[in-house]
A protein has these predicted regions:
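Hydrophobic alpha-helical connector segments
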Residues: 67, 81-110, 157
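Helix-turn-helix
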Residues: 21, 29-63
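Amphipathic alpha-helical segments used for helix-helix packing
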Residues: 106-125, 142-145, 177
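Amphipathic alpha-helical packing segments from all-alpha helical-bundle domains
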Residues: 74, 124-150, 158-174, 189, ...
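C-terminal peripheral helix-coil segments that are non-catalytic and often amphipathic
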Residues: 1-7, 103, 107, 139, ...
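Amphipathic alpha-helical segments that line or abut small-molecule/effector binding pockets
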Residues: 24, 91-106, 166, 170, ...
């Protein structure tokens, strides 16, 4: 006979709420003082929970930050996917999706600056997660370009290669970093034409 679960719907809801509050607190604390200077005491105080609750969800502050990074990256990727218009030429799809992406980032300038900068300070694990997220974005670009109705008669698998898709994401990422350094996150949508051109230029020349 199967033993009854000790996790009720109420318990699950409470755990979800605590995790959400901890992630929000991590965002605020890391934005104000950086991950290196942040302490678990800072995070739980901001979240209004105990240290015990923190350790029920995360091993350390770095794990908490990486969870925040993954969560916000997934939200940004969802914005990109929702902006795709499959019946339009891929060039139009890319431009529309990137404009929505930049608008999404510009809506939270403090968080964007924290995530894009602080991830570089988390050593090999931070690098691994960053590459994981960049690969997901590259897959999106690859699918959008190669799945679009206008590929110039070139076999879809040859319009944009995985390597060039990753290069496009890397280039766009650097444009965002530059905007952060200049304090121009609120103007990110102005990068849409340039970022779209990066993707177009990295497709095969005979697919133009």
């Amino acid at each position: 006979m199967k033993a009854p679960s000790m996790v009720t719907n109420d318990t699950t809801s409470e755990l979800h709420e605590h995790r959400s509050r901890l992630l929000q607190a991590m965002a605020g604390v890391s934005a104000s003082k950086g991950v290196a200077a942040a302490t678990i005491a800072d995070i739980v105080r901001e979240a209004g929970v105990s240290k015990r609750t923190f350790y029920e969800h995360f091993d350390c502050k770095e794990t908490c930050f990486l969870a925040l990074y993954r969560l916000t990256s997934a939200s940004a990727l969802r914005t990109l996917r929702e902006a795709v218009q499959p019946d339009r030429p891929w060039q139009t799809q890319v431009e529309h999706a990137l404009d929505a992406y930049f608008a999404h980032l510009a809506a939270g300038p403090g968080l964007v600056g924290t995530l894009f900068v602080e991830i570089h300070h988390l050593g090999s694990e931070g690098l691994r997660v960053r590459r994981e997220v960049m690969a997901q974005f590259a897959d999106f670009v690859l699918e959008t370009v190669n799945g679009g109705p206008d590929s110039g008669g070139v076999p879809l698998s040859q319009v944009l290669t995985p390597t060039m898709a990753l290069a496009a994401v890397g280039g766009i990422n650097e444009l965002v970093m530059l905007a952060i350094e200049r304090g121009e996150v609120d103007r990110l949508q102005e990068l849409t034409p340039c970022a779209s051109a990066v993707v177009r230029l990295l497709t095969r020349a005979d697919a133009a």
